[in-house]
Amino acid sequence: MWHPAKDTHRSVCWIICARSIVHSFNCHIFTLNQKQYIMAHLNLTLDNLEELIPDSLSQDQKAKVKTLFYKELALRAHRFYNGKMQTLPKAPVMGFNWFNAWYTPGVSKISTTIRDDNDTSYELSGRGNLVAVVSDSTRVLGDGDCTPPGGMGVMEGKAFLMKYLGGVNGIALCVDSRGPDGKNDPQKIIDFVKMSQHSFGAINLEDIAQPNCYKVLDVLREECDIPVWHDDAQGTACVTLAGLFNALKLVDKKLEDVKIVYFGAGASNATIARIVNSAGADPARSIMFDSSGALHTGRKDIEEDKRFYRKWELCQVTNPHKVETMEEAMKDADVLIALSRPGPDVVKKEWIEKMADKSIVFVCANPVPEIYPYAAKEAGAHIVATGRGDFPNQVNNSIGFPGILKGALIVRASKITDNMAIAAAEAIARFSEKRGIHTEDIIAKMSESEVFPFEAADVAMQAIKDGVARKEMTWQEAYDLAKEDIKQARDTTKSLIDNGFIEKPPQEMLDESLEVAIKQVTG
């Protein structure tokens, strides 16, 4: 006979079920069938999440449950593990006498060798495969200014993805960019990066609010001796372009012919527009909106504020007819690219209904898209992409920056050019098309490990073509090196888990997170 005390997992299952039954009696929400959903366990891979969300919930409620679940799980998991990253040696300790070589007195030879030739720092230290993830946390996802340490979760997450997907070591550096007046000063970030660049192979800028982000990136790209990459802007642009390439193939339209509406004019969308135009789109056939309306040459507020020079550049080349409203702009538009604010219901179904046949809709606000995919489809969208992995067609930086940074590091590039970003987009699109694409699967997923070395090799070759590489190699050499580093990173992580050095997440943490999410939605 079963007794709860003798079976922990079944005890947890019984407790969750009992709580749910009580809740059902009180609120008359959970049916008998729904109780069976709660009784089942979430897999550690989380791949059965949708099966455990009650069928009686609407699509909107189900989407909210998923969002709330991942937020609750994130909080519990980060607290359980005390963050996501740690430092481990890459060299052996065969005995304590080895510290005489790894440290003093032997390490003196390393110091003088690098002093005499700074380039040897890439061979004699871990610098060549190390990226600083730098942020002042002034625009963290859709949560705004989170104070300097508030960005640590995202920055550590970026470093986590770099390592696991790209075989690149990353370190989170959240800095305080506020001056004596309390205002965020971009020069503080610029000075910090320029002073610390000699410890890294590349810099990844993250979650810096506009307009400061424009100055920080543009100055550092020119004044640093290592690549400086703004992932919110350049990374988003790269992956969006990759998705757009394949979406256009599926609807048999050409980039140079389509009408594009950009909803949101922050760093991400402004850079997307610039990169998409560089890839062949006609800027005169595009219209961009910020929170004050459409961009065009009549926007004196943008022209007069020199901090927004990137937006003013777009005012001069887009929307020649000075269309003022989204309703008018969306008439016969082929593509909508929205990166504005978290939804849903930020993008209206009525707008999508005005679009051309076989319309393409990218709604990439995080953590909730401007309109849910099902609603966009109901309004007539043919292809819908979001920034989330739990919906079809995830257009997320995670498929781009690990390979791009790896490619730049492999050839010791001095910068990442726009051509390198476009090469990455083309590589992602080509890889995705080769393995097969359709309207619900336009771009490779981060689980497809082969895309990253493929992308890295193409980026490395473009760096050589652009004359910014310090190291020459063939495409195959770059591919093999990236693939081996990625394999080693994944194998190391697996070994740490298999041998108990990284504890597996407790089943209770998963089940309770889902229970909390469902209760928050159902009341």
Model-assigned labels for residue ranges:
Residues 17-38:
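Short, Lys/Arg-enriched N-terminal segments with co-localized hydrophobic residues
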